[in-house]
């Protein structure tokens, strides 16, 4: 929306959709203990459909988009901040974090340039829409998702079954078990 600024506050770990939901906010903060998994691949090569193809490149470079989504590795809040994925992280308790976010949001609302920030946000969104409408991102993501659901590769359905029925992996996935690559 171009009538308000939004803040995402991550107190706990987030995977795929949770990470990309937070990227829809204007400002993103996390506790320093938070671990993010900004990818869907571990769910049977799922492509994802939360406008991530629009949101992620707004925050990180193209090379980081590729490494984050292809390598399937978790990232801690400090590294996420250093990449620009989130705006900041704080080494505080849950209660202190809530207070810190409240203070940050109140400070943001009281900024003398608040309305200029809203105008900049609206202008950027308008330019983005002219370059490529949000609907195009949605259509492309859903086309890829359709392949996950109805294509030749059954890995999504197997991963979904295991996820729904809480069946753990039989072994550590190879992309995490680097010692097995010898």
Where are these regions (language model features)?
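C-terminal long alpha-helix characteristic of the crotonase
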Residues: 30-31, 47, 86-156
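Glycine-rich beta-to-alpha active-site loop
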Residues: 1-43
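Well-ordered beta-strand positions
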Residues: 26-27, 67, 71-73, 79, ...
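Patatin-like phospholipase
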Residues: 153-157, 164-182
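Hydrophobic, secondary-structure "cap" segments at the distal end of domains
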Residues: 53-63
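Glycine-rich beta-to-alpha transition loops that act as phosphate-gripper elements at the mouths
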Residues: 9-14, 68-74
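Hydrophobic/aromatic residues within transmembrane alpha-helices
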Residues: 21-22, 80, 145
């Amino acid at each position: 929306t171009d009538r308000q600024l939004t803040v995402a506050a991550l107190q706990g770990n987030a995977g795929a959709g949770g990470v990309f939901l937070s990227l829809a906010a204007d400002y993103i903060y996390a506790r320093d203990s938070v671990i993010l998994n900004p990818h869907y691949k571990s769910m049977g090569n799922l492509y994802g459909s939360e406008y991530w193809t629009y949101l992620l490149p707004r925050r990180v470079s193209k090379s980081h988009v590729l490494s984050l989504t292809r390598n399937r590795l978790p990232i801690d809040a400090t590294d996420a901040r250093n990449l620009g994925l989130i705006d900041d992280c704080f080494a505080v308790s849950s209660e202190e974090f809530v207070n810190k976010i409240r203070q940050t949001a109140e400070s943001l609302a009281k900024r003398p340039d608040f309305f200029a920030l809203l105008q900049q946000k609206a202008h950027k969104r308008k330019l983005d829409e002219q370059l490529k409408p949000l609907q195009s991102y949605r259509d492309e993501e859903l086309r890829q998702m359709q392949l996950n659901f109805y294509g030749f590769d059954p890995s999504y359905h197997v991963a979904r079954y295991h996820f729904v029925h809480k069946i753990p992996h039989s072994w550590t996935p190879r992309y995490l078990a680097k010692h097995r690559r010898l």
